[in-house]
């Protein structure tokens, strides 16, 4: 479910937030990617694995037996528990296509990971390359797991305070900012959904208060002033 209580960051606030990360290669890179792709933290870092631990009765359903007689059966829902320290998906160094300016991501849909692609700006590509070289990362290394999942969430709060932002800021603000800025430029929900991996274009309307090649040029042009 998409949260509706996010207080939007203005461009000035987002610029200030980015300025506070200068000198910290990892967080500057992570925030820049999040800001210019609108991707969820789970798609960048990876989603925490879960295991089935049982089922919960949530109601009843009526079915018919072989004689046509109505039978009341329990309607259940699977209960999952997160597995500490284990993640699936997430961007690896080999998922960055420097030649074509694309990045593979794994989107969780109906508990299954589905491969998608997102467009990267020239600045973002250069920043990623700089980080990879400086940290001597290999093809199989996970690009955004140089810090813990929790650590990244806490860092957003810390850097936003240093930037002088008074309202609450979370990692979701980057996705919110990305969508909001594109809508200000007149982008349709359908076009934005192709970039963000939203399940439906209808979900994007909440932000009103495989990459299609036909929008790559438009995307890079729009992101120049992000």
What label would you give each PLM region?
Residues 2, 7, 11-41, 45:
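Basic, Lys/Arg- and aromatic-enriched nucleic-acid-binding interface segment
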Residues 1-5, 65, 73, 222-226:
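C-terminal secondary-structure termini that scaffold catalytic or DNA-interacting sites
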Residues 1-15, 111-123, 137-139, 218:
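DNA breakage-rejoining catalytic core of tyrosine-based enzymes
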Residues 196-221:
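Catalytic-site neighborhood detector that most strongly recognizes the C-terminal catalytic loop/helix
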Residues 20, 33-34, 181-185, 195:
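Short alpha-helical segment immediately N-terminal to, or the first helix within
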Residues 149, 166-186:
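Short basic/aromatic active-site micro-motif
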Residues 121-166:
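Active-site/catalytic core of tyrosine-dependent DNA strand-transfer enzymes
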Residues 46-127:
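Conserved tyrosine-mediated DNA breakage-rejoining catalytic core shared by Y-recombinases
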């Amino acid at each position: 479910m998409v949260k509706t209580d996010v207080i939007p960051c203005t461009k000035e606030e987002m610029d200030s937030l980015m300025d506070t990360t200068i000198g910290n290669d990892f967080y500057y890179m992570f925030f820049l990617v999040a800001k210019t792709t609108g991707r969820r933290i789970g798609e960048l870092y990876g989603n925490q694995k879960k295991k089935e631990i049982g089922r919960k009765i949530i109601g009843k359903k009526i079915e018919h037996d072989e004689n046509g007689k109505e039978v009341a059966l329990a309607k259940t829902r699977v209960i999952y528990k997160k597995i500490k320290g284990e993640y699936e998906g997430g961007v690896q160094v080999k998922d960055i296509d420097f030649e074509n300016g694309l990045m593979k991501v794994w989107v969780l849909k109906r508990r299954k990971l589905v491969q998608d692609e997102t467009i990267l700006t020239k600045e973002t590509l250069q920043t990623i390359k700089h980080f990879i070289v400086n940290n001597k990362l290999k093809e199989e290394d996970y690009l955004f797991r140089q810090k813990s999942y929790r650590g990244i969430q806490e860092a957003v709060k810390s850097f936003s305070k240093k930037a002088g932002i008074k309202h609450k800021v979370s990692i979701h603000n980057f996705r919110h900012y990305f969508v909001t800025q594109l809508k200000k430029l007149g982008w349709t929900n359908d076009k934005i959904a192709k970039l963000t991996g939203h399940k439906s274009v209808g979900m994007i309307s909440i932000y009103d208060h495989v990459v299609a090649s036909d929008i790559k040029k438009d995307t890079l042009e729009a992101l120049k002033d992000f």
